[in-house]
Every structure is written in C-alpha cells, then in structure tokens.
Amino acid sequence: DFVRLVKGISFKEALAFLSEEPFQKETVQEKRERPFYYPLKRIEDSHCSLARYYLTECRGISEEIVQKMIQQGLIVQASWKTNETVEPVIVFKSFNHRHKLQAASLQGIYKNHSLPRERLKTILKGSHGHVGISFDIGKPNRLVFCESFIDLMSYYELHQQSLTDVRLVSMEGLKRSVVAYQTLRLIAEENQRLEFLDTVIPSKLLPLINTIRDTTSYFDNHPDLLTLAVDCDDAGKDFSDKLSQSGFPVFLDFPDNKSGKEKVDWNDVLREKKSDLQLMIENAKETLRNQPVRKTSQCLEL
C-alpha cells in the first residue's frame, strides 16, 4: 500500500518493485497508542472572551485571525484545575486527517510568577504529539512548520497576502515526527488514499518518510514542499540543520533578529511591527496637534 501510495502504481507493479529493489532493513518498535481522551469538553466557554483578550491585546494577533481559528474549532477557552486553583486557559486543539481530536495544548491567561514562564503551559496527558495543529489556506500543496500555535497565527498575519494553497502546522515544539506525519498526509491527500494513513502507527512515520526520500524522486519533484518557520535560536537552527542534512529539501524562514537577541519568534516580530506602527501613529498625531493654527481674515466680495 505504501509503494502504491507514493508511486501511484497497481498492486502487481508494487509487488514487482518490492521484489527487485534491495531495501535496507530497519527495526521498528510496534507501539499502538490509546485513543486520546479530552476531559475539558463539558467546561468549555463558547464565548472565549478571555482567550480573545489575551491573544489580541497581549499577543497582538488580529481579531479576524483569532475568530477564524475559533470558528474552525482550533481554539477554545476552558477551566483548568492546578492543585486547589482553578484558572481560565486557552486550549489549542490538534485534529488528524480524519478530523478526530488527537491532542490538546493549554496556555494560561493570567500571570503566575511561581511558574518558570509566568503562565501555565502544558500538553494534556495522552496527547498524540506526532499530529501537530494544522490550518489550511486554499488547497494545500506545501507545508509551513512553526513551533507553537501562537507563532503560527503570527506568521499567518505577517504573510497572509502571499500565502496560497498552503497548510500551516504547529509542531508544539520541535518534532520531526510531525514533519513526517504531515508530509505523508499531504501525499495521501494528493493520491486520494487517506485510508493508508489509518494503518500507520507513529513509530513507522520516520522510517516511511526516509523510504520515500531514498527510493523515490518525490522530494526532487517537490523542492518547495517543506518550509521551517521556527524560532531564531540555537534549538531552532539545530533542528533545521539536522533535517536539511538528512537529505530533505527544506526552505528556512527564520524571523529577523536584527537586535541580536538570544531568541526571537514570529510573535516577537508581529508585536514589534505593531508597536512600531503605533509609535508612528502617535508621532503623527503629536505633529498634527503642534501645527500652528491658520489665521483667516474676512474679505469683501466685489
């Protein structure tokens, strides 16, 4: 089925191909994952008022983009209990190729100075981390990978005029398994063979994408398939370098780091751009207020 998917050939032709080609054996550990259980459904807040406020006012993302993500079911607001404290959180949802919920990441709204990053950040237990959180623009024929969903929304807002027929994917970290799954998903969609993905377990994702690289010309024929829009830091660069050195054609789209900071992500770029724009507007208003008032005098019409 895998050979038929990638090469678009018949069953007999696939058998002939497998009998002729010398393949390197790989040891794959079989591990069936349990279905993901989502415990927050009954305590979701459909209004998402606090989530909207945090994403627009604190993160600088436009109301229009936040609304799109809410409408597609990728963002909801819920309550989360930590020890004896209940707090509102934003839930970012991950759906697979059958639009079944596979994972959920939580983002705290209120600051908590006892936490390392000041706000709650966690992934729900039992999440299938190989899927990622995806958002489609048009009919996707290429993939753009970000580290977080907030970065994904920021990247979308900054580039929306030039983004067509693309799937934006949040890896929720730096996960090669997400790159493998989403690549196989795109190939399966192109060949109308989504049923193939139903049979693939997570431990087979990397061996399968490596086989495509080694035995087909798929990546040669699709040089613009993969874009990494990860953070501009040591971890992001290391992840990108390793993927490129593995023989995959990868276009690198790091956020600008003109100030030479240790880490810059796409949300940093978005907020800085909006801050600069706001400063320009305030300066223009101040200039207009300080302009001298024109004196007018009456004249007689002859």
Protein language model features and the residues they cover:
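Basic, glycine-enriched DNA-binding surface that flanks or lies within the catalytic cores of DNA
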Residues: E33-I137, Q161
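Conserved mixed alpha/beta catalytic, RNA-binding, or beta-rich assembly cores of soluble enzyme
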Residues: F145-S148, G173-K175
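Short active-site oxyanion
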Residues: K139-L143, D224-T227
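Short, glycine-/Ser/Thr-/acidic-enriched flexible segments
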Residues: H97, I150, D233-D234
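Non-catalytic accessory segments of DNA primases and related replication-initiation nucleases
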Residues: D1-C58
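Terminal peptide-recognition signature
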Residues: V3, L55, F92, H99, ...
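Short active-site loop/helix that positions an aromatic residue
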Residues: L5, L152-Q160
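TOPRIM fold recognition
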Residues: H159-L302
